[in-house]
Amino acid sequence: MSSTSLPSSGKPLKLRINRDSEGYLSLVTESGEIYRCPICGNDRFVYNYERGEVVCIVCGAVVQEQLLDLGPEWRAFTSEEKGQRARTGAPLTRLISEALTTVIDWRDKDVSGRELDIKRKLEVIRLRKWQTRARVQTSYERNFIQAAQELERLKSSMGVPRPCVEQALEIYRQALEKELVRGRSVEAMAAAALYMACRMMRMPRPLDELVRYTKASRREVARCYRLLLRELNVKVPISDPVLYISRIAEQLKLSGEVVKAAIDILQRAKKAGITAGKDPAGLAAAAVYIASLMHGDNRTQKDFAVAAGVTEVTVRNRYKELAKALNIKVPVK
């Protein structure tokens, strides 16, 4: 991959570097927002050890240079090697240690995914109850631990970055202190907190996608989100459709040229005033679909709908609106 250096602004950015399980880097600003490549909008990077540079994996732009590697000096290729060579503890996190311990799952299924018989199910319910009681004392602690476990589970299922989960836990803590959780399910409130945190961190996820991974209904989660928005003193930015592009492109393995074209389409749509009141995920999917057709990638609208977490009808309607309003002549398949 060829690298392109960005023009220097004179003042270096102060970014915190996180590394995921696949070895890719994510950058977090001092204000807690996820940093994105200014060229293509991607949020995943790699580290060039020889040059001390952080490089975008999509377009190859160098977003940070002349960095010191603050990680360990040793290399490990398996989790066993990493555990043997590590000489320090885990990084500090808002997620309390009790929330990261092994718990008995709520699905009441065995290791093969089969439903437990009624006798075994009652036994598991009793064990789950005693495990919760043994770990914490007060109702406040039990509720908070349960929420932390639920957020950790959602993080693993959805692939949400840890900064978003930590922010969601902080939101839940505030809701718990104001007694907003009383009378509402922990699952719905935790999902609403995560939805809010992802938007605050500029890494929005569609609500329908989040609901697929929780026991709470879409109506419950939406109601809890509106409650948090009304009662907590937090500022949630309006979702920018551009923020959805990198994730759609990553799932469909699209080129950097398609990403740039999709971003340009959305920027033109904003200037034309046709993005207000529209679902940002649907707009992003339609823009990427148009950009793909313009670059000869003739995939179906269903592919883009699945990647964005919206319906095929939404992609089709937004596609027609963008093409008509911006006078884009899309090549016919």
From Swiss-Prot:
The keyword NADP does not apply. Disulfide bonds: none annotated. Sequence repeats lie at residues 149-232, 243-324. InterPro entries: Cyclin-like_dom, Cyclin-like_sf, TFIIB, TFIIB_arc, TFIIB_CS, TFIIB_cyclin, Znf_TFIIB. A zinc finger (TFIIB-type) spans 33-64. Gene3D superfamilies: 1.10.472.170, Cyclin-like. GO terms for biological process: transcription preinitiation complex assembly. Keywords: Metal-binding, Repeat, Transcription, Transcription regulation, Zinc, Zinc-finger. GO terms for molecular function: DNA-binding transcription factor activity; TBP-class protein binding; zinc ion binding. Zn(2+) binds at residues 37, 40, 56, 59. One of its GO terms (cellular component) is transcription preinitiation complex. Stabilizes TBP binding to an archaeal box-A promoter. Also responsible for recruiting RNA polymerase II to the pre-initiation complex (DNA-TBP-TFIIB). Belongs to the TFIIB family. This is Transcription initiation factor IIB. It comes from Pyrobaculum arsenaticum (strain DSM 13514 / JCM 11321 / PZ6). The gene is tfb.
